[in-house]
């Protein structure tokens, strides 16, 4: 992220977050369609819902809660969510070796790194200096399991993809709330 106006930094970060969230949602759907029998999907989704590491972070759970937090807090939460996936996504390309939707899986890590850098640039702008490591936890998710013949591995990956999708949705929401708060525009209704 070269030096640019704050509005451009926010616009770029939101676009990157939206793209990653859509990629995560498409990947989740493709994995589900390919590996999870239709009759099991709903019950598995409910069972997996409680296992997202991000649920242990005291972060806002929706747009209304996000609006109660400062921009710096929202950036820190977004950064934490993004960083928690940097390790696990490096294994995604092995899980989706012959996937059409996930043909770009090798680039997911780079896209996450770009978003991480964009969030750090926003933090520098808003904090007038370098981002403080502060409360950034270094906890992360497990790696994706590349053994797709095992039911346990399939369920683990399904749960991880569900968490990945949820976490990217949260990061996108936080960035959009901040952008709308600072730069009122027609695309703020979401």
UniProtKB/Swiss-Prot annotation:
The modification Phosphoserine is found at residue 105. GO terms for molecular function: growth factor activity; growth hormone receptor binding; hormone activity; metal ion binding. Zn(2+) binds at residues 19, 172. Its main location: secreted. Disulfide bonds join 52-163, 180-188. One of its GO terms (biological process) is response to nutrient levels. InterPro entries: 4_helix_cytokine-like_core (IPR009079), Somatotropin (IPR034975), Somatotropin/Prolactin (IPR001400), Somatotropin_CS (IPR018116). Keywords: Disulfide bond, Hormone, Metal-binding, Phosphoprotein, Secreted, Zinc. Pfam families: Hormone_1. GO terms for cellular component: extracellular space. Gene3D superfamilies: 1.20.1250.10. Transmembrane segments: none annotated. It is found in: Secreted. Plays an important role in growth control. Its major role in stimulating body growth is to stimulate the liver and other tissues to secrete IGF1. It stimulates both the differentiation and proliferation of myoblasts. It also stimulates amino acid uptake and protein synthesis in muscle and other tissues. Belongs to the somatotropin/prolactin family. This is Somatotropin.
């Amino acid at each position: 992220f070269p030096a640019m106006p704050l509005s451009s930094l926010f616009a770029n970060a939101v676009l990157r977050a939206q793209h990653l969230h859509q990629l995560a949602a498409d990947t989740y759907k493709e994995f589900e369609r390919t590996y999870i029998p239709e009759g099991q999907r709903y019950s598995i989704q409910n069972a997996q819902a409680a296992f997202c590491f991000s649920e242990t972070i005291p972060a806002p759970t929706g747009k209304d809660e996000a609006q109660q937090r400062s921009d710096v807090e929202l950036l820190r939460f977004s950064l934490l969510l993004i960083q928690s996936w940097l390790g696990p996504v490096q294994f995604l390309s092995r899980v989706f070796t012959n996937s059409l939707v996930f043909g770009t899986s090798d680039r997911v890590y780079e896209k996450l790194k770009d978003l991480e850098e964009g969030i750090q640039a926003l933090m520098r702008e808003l904090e007038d200096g370098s981002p403080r490591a502060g409360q950034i936890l270094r906890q992360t998710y497990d790696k994706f399991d590349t053994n797709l013949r095992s039911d346990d591995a399939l369920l683990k990956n399904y749960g991880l993809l569900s968490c990945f999708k949820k976490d990217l949705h949260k990061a996108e929401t936080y960035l959009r709330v901040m952008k709308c708060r600072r730069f009122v525009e027609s695309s703020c209704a979401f």
